[in-house]
């Protein structure tokens, strides 16, 4: 017990606590993850995360390529290709903006391109609705994207770090979308424990694309034309990678608890009144 108490005290001293929003928490995660390329285009309510990212860049706290695109389609195309070139990337959108990027969103998993994106959940403007709804994120449910919903600003920061760890694992190489309820989470403030850079570096290795790196010294073809037989094989490989995420996620959460001293229990879902359930 004394040894555990000493470990927890050391972890406490290595963290600082700040009153920030869910969007700010994601921006801080980008800083801690040392993201290389970030693209932005404004649409409520996700736009707040890019405002905070831009402040970090302007203040010299985050050294990255911060690119303001002309639309969501370009936004996701830029980070897709940057990731193929070995850059750690971040992007995001909300509602119909997420829909506008659908071509890039569809192609990214099939190319085995890891990225982390934030979805500031918002209704798809039907009929003129701007409140919280999850249909934006759910459009990529069957396309090979990992989907995560977070409840708090603390969970948003922690999950973003875990998302990079899982998405960039060579066994996975799939994108991950973190859903944050618009306004309720993106704009509301809460006390958040911000881990030290040293701890994050211990938890999160650098992104290594290895032989799949798109580089002049490694000329490879990205997205070659494939017939229907190869398309089915690509789908099979995507499914196999998604099946492997369960093991990689468990590893990531175990390491997260060991390094940061925080645990979320079951990493896949939260249980409520399920003790005697046969089907959930």
What are these regions (language model features)?
Residues 39, 177-179, 280:
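Structured core elements
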């Amino acid at each position: 017990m004394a040894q555990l108490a000493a470990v927890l005290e050391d972890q406490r001293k290595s963290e600082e606590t700040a009153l920030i929003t869910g969007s700010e928490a994601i921006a801080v995660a980008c800083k801690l993850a040392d993201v290389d390329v970030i693209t932005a285009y404004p649409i409520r309510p996700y736009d707040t995360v890019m405002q905070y990212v831009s402040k970090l860049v302007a203040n010299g706290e985050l050294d990255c390529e911060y690119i303001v695109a002309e639309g969501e389609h370009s936004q996701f195309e830029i980070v897709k290709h940057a990731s193929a070139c070995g850059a750690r990337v971040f992007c995001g959108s909300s509602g119909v903006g997420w829909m506008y990027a659908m071509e890039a969103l569809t192609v990214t998993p099939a190319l085995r391109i890891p990225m982390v994106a934030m979805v500031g959940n918002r209704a798809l403007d039907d009929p003129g609705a701007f409140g919280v709804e999850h249909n934006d994120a759910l459009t990529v449910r069957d396309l090979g994207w990992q989907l995560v919903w977070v409840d708090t600003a603390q969970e948003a920061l922690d999950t973003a770090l875990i998302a990079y760890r899982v998405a960039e694992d060579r066994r996975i190489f799939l994108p991950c979308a973190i859903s944050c309820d618009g306004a309720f989470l993106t704009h509301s403030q809460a006390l958040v424990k911000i881990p030290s850079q040293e701890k994050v570096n211990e938890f999160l290795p650098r992104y290594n694309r290895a032989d799949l790196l798109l580089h002049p010294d490694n000329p490879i073809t990205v997205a070659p034309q494939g017939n229907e037989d190869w398309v089915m094989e690509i789908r099979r490989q995507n499914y196999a990678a998604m099946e492997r995420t369960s093991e990689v996620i468990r590893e990531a959460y175990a390491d997260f608890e060991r390094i940061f001293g925080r645990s979320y229990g079951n990493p896949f879902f939260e249980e409520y009144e399920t003790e005697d359930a046969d089907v959930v």
